[in-house]
Curated annotation (Swiss-Prot):
One of its GO terms (molecular function) is acylphosphatase activity. It comes from the Bacteria. This is Acylphosphatase. Keywords: Hydrolase. It catalyses: an acyl phosphate + H2O = a carboxylate + phosphate + H(+). Its EC number is 3.6.1.7. It comes from Cronobacter sakazakii (strain ATCC BAA-894) (Enterobacter sakazakii). The active site is at R14, N32.
């Protein structure tokens, strides 16, 4: 689980995160939170999850401005079949 803070809403952040996660073979979701951050849940091989986290920390899409990424290990209670954008 990751929370991405900065200018990450209204800039295509969830869409490009979905694309990158799918490219890495991950499942889960990305959703906007009321505080202006984006929550990302990524499930899959640990190495691929780490690659997504590194991508998030590197700033994600060019249109975004990531200030910080907070992460926390998470054991999902759902079995995600793909990576989706949640609303």
């Amino acid at each position: 689980m990751a929370w991405v803070h900065g200018r990450v809403q209204g800039v295509g952040f969830r869409y490009t995160t979905q694309h990158e996660a799918t490219r890495l073979g991950l499942t889960g979701y990305a959703r906007n939170l009321d505080d202006g951050s984006v929550e990302v849940l990524a499930c899959g091989e640990a190495e691929q999850v780490e690659k997504l986290i590194a991508w998030l920390k590197a700033g994600g899409p060019r249109s975004a401005h990531v200030e910080k990424v907070l992460t926390e290990p998470h054991s999902p209670t759902e079995d995600y079949q793909d990576f989706r954008i949640r609303y």
